[in-house]
Amino acid sequence: MMPFRTQPDALVPNYNLSVQDVYTDTARILMTSHGTLSLLSHVEDPSHRRIPNLPSWVPDYSVVQDPYALQYRGPCYWKASGNLTWSPNILTMANGELEVTGYHLDTIDKTSTLQTELEDPSAFWATIVKLASTLELPYPDPGNSNETPGRIELLWRTLTTNTYNRTYPAPSEIGSLFIDYILNLQIRHRLTPWSSSDEFQPHHSPLSESVYPDWRTLFRLEPPESPYSWDRYRKRLAMVVESMFDGTYSPIGLAQLQHEFDQGSGSRRRLFKTKGGYIGTGARSLGKGDEVWILHGGSVPFILRPQHDGYHSLIGESFVYGVMHGEVQSLSLPRRQVTIL
């Protein structure tokens, strides 16, 4: 591992140093030897940190990393900052301050809940559907890709970090798989079994509308020609129900999609929307008012939280649909110097 392969004395044991100093020195040496900000993707969620008074940009090596960094989702080769490089300030890093250069892409204004924060699994999806329904179209296209994804496509591609079975970008046919996934969710949520001690309830509806995902509204927002239109969804629903009665339907193909959701979102990462209409997924602890930054030398966007006197703290890495390959350079955003504590 760099730099220890070529510089075996890069870290010298010093038992007079505190744990915080040892971790900070390790992070500084790893980052300066690589010349990138890739180590920031290995910083765990703030809620999982055990070592107190550790700079927010320094990983807490005493905890297990969960989730793994986005780079392990597959051979994605994200390069959010394009060819822009990071110039380290070794002196300030030794004092716990990380100086970076970058672009404030946008500010988070809406977030979803996590599976672990709600008792009812349908309520988890209700917050996701509600967030997706607020997306304005056309979606921002800083890379001039001329693509015009609808809200449902934006949703599933973001929840999976646009990756399926280690393939990036995810094949378009995964959209059809997502439709079947939604159908299975609705059947499971609406037909939740009642207690065996209860009598038959022909109009049993265990969920209040406030926690039930409003998929119908989301589908009806799609144009008629969309593969995710309301009419196509209803036809697929009829086909699935018929195949269930025939005994020919098997949802086993949804297992891989569930795995992608578990890794890209679920209980591990929180879905968010920005004021400017971007959708993304990031650290559990992100919240309204946090900022999305593209930093020189960073392969993915990062979530920073403004602190006192213009400083920032690192919340974690993120996936933001549409800005993962250097598109930020075409936005004419002001380049800023930021210090992360």
Locate predicted features.
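Acidic/Ser/Thr/Pro-rich low-complexity tail/linker regions in eukaryotic proteins
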Residues: 2-341
